[in-house]
């Protein structure tokens, strides 16, 4: 009898020990898992950062994605020319009688181009891109707010892209614009950790979903396009609902940044202002109070180019009062960073980085700096890196 009890006790103890070991292994695995969220308004560069992580830490792009990119990139170009031709027709740029046919086709009936046979589609893209009116457009209005950012990369590469044997390069895929719908996650090993990086759609209609991913977030990477200072938000008044729902949770009223932009038409919101407001409402969110906040002030290359043609204080008059208001990229970036910091409670730390998400090495380096903070290495409270 005694022996039986002894055996049962030993078996129970063994079982307990096995369960303990299992729990310890699971806890350790969970500790290795780091959840990171990419947030920001649409077109800021979130998905581009995910692409760079895939290039750096996973297998990059597969064959299907590369083939699919041929069509997405050509549609990106058709959409860009649609806007460009529209602006041309409403400007003082001379359009010859011969040019008018295709310029009007792109401006008003671009859907028809997407339905053409590939050879015809390439013919019209090649023809229109060589027009004098298009060249003039790029000389005078390249940084018009209606011109998508990717065209600054695709236009000089059109000879290659609009040819029948085109195979997109990794760089082409990084510059390609594809709106994110829904929520996407990638997972990769980084030092001793497993990073779960979550990418969301930035459109107003998509933002309602964000709050469902706020639990257990180690770091928020908030991405803002520095080049968005002369752009407006997508106009979807209905979708403003999300902001009230997000703020209801934390019981706070959304505060607008002090130096906000001058807006030409009533009802329009400056995209940089929108980004700052969105950042502040997220930074204050109680679910994220334990998270590290990394601000990616992105598209620094486009900011530099844009400032050669556009005067920042025309959009943000408060910049005239800034210490160095020389319209240089450095001073404008500092002003923008300050817009994000203004009004933040001092204990709410934030690490800001100037980035160019289209450059693989730049994102690799910035991500390493962010991880130094997250994993607790020594780190000075940063200003722009
Ligand atoms: N020139 C330039 N283009 C960028 C940069 N970051 C992103 N883009 C481009 O901006 C567009 C929108 O980027 P995407 O990552 O889709 O934005 P999301 O809506 O925030 O996910 C794409 O065409 C990108 O290639 C950058 O630093 N410089
Ligand atoms: Mg995206």
Curated annotation (Swiss-Prot):
One of its GO terms (biological process) is adenylate cyclase-modulating G protein-coupled receptor signaling pathway. Residues 35-48 are annotated as: G1 motif. SMART domains: G_alpha. GTP binds at residues 40-47, 174-180, 199-203, 298-301, 357. A lipid is attached at residue 2 (N-myristoyl glycine). Pfam families: G-alpha (PF00503). Residues 355-360 are annotated as: G5 motif. Mg(2+) binds at residues 47, 180. Residues 172-180 are annotated as: G2 motif. Keywords: GTP-binding, Lipoprotein, Magnesium, Metal-binding, Myristate, Nucleotide-binding, Palmitate, Transducer. Gene3D superfamilies: GI Alpha 1, domain 2-like (1.10.400.10), P-loop containing nucleotide triphosphate hydrolases (3.40.50.300). Residues 32-385 form the G-alpha domain. One of its GO terms (molecular function) is metal ion binding. Residues 294-301 are annotated as: G4 motif. Residues 195-204 are annotated as: G3 motif. A lipid is attached at residue 6 (S-palmitoyl cysteine). GO terms for cellular component: axon; cytoplasm; heterotrimeric G-protein complex; neuronal cell body; synapse. Belongs to the G-alpha family. Guanine nucleotide-binding proteins (G proteins) are involved as modulators or transducers in various transmembrane signaling systems. G proteins are composed of 3 units; alpha, beta and gamma. The alpha chain contains the guanine nucleotide binding site. This is Guanine nucleotide-binding protein alpha-5 subunit. It comes from Caenorhabditis elegans.
């Amino acid at each position: 009898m005694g022996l039986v009890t002894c055996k049962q006790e030993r078996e129970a103890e063994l079982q307990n020990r096995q369960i303990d070991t299992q729990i310890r292994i699971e806890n350790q695995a969970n500790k290795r898992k780091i959840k990171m969220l990419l947030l920001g308004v649409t077109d800021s560069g979130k998905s581009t950062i995910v692409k760079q992580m895939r290039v750096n830490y996973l297998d990059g792009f597969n064959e299907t994605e590369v083939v699919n990119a041929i069509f997405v990139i050509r549609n990106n170009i058709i959409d860009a020319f649609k806007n460009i031709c529209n602006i041309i027709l409403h400007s003082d740029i001379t359009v010859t009688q011969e040019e008018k046919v295709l310029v009007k086709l792109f401006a008003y009936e671009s859907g028809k181009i997407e339905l053409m046979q590939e050879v015809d589609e390439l013919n019209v893209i090649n023809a229109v891109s060589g027009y004098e009116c298009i060249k003039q457009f790029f000389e005078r209005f390249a940084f018009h707010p209606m011109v998508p950012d990717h065209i600054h990369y695709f236009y000089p590469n059109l000879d290659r892209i609009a040819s029948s044997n085109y195979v997109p390069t990794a760089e082409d895929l990084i510059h390609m614009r594809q709106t994110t719908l829904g929520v996407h996650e990638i997972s990769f090993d980084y030092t001793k950790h497993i990073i779960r990086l979550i990418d969301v759609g930035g459109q107003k209609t998509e933002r309602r979903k964000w709050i469902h991913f706020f639990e257990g977030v180690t770091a928020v990477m908030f991405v803002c396009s520095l080049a968005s200072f002369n752009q407006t938000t997508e106009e979807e008044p209905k979708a403003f609902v999300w902001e009230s729902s997000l703020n209801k949770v934390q019981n706070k009223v959304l505060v607008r940044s002090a130096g906000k932009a001058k807006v030409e038409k009533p009802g329009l919101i400056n995209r940089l202002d929108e980004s700052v407001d969105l950042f502040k409402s997220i930074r204050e969110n109680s679910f994220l109070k334990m998270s590290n906040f990394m601000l990616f002030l992105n598209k620094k290359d486009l900011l530099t180019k844009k400032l050669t043609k556009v005067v920042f204080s025309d959009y943000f008059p408060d910049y005239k009062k800034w210490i160095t208001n020389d319209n240089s990229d450095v001073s404008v970036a500092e002003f923008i960073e300050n817009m994000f910091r203004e009004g933040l409670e001092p204990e709410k730390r934030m690490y800001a980085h100037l980035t160019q998400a289209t450059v693989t090495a730049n994102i690799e380096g910035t991500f390493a700096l962010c991880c130094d903070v997250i994993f607790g290495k020594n780190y000075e409270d940063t200003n722009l890196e």
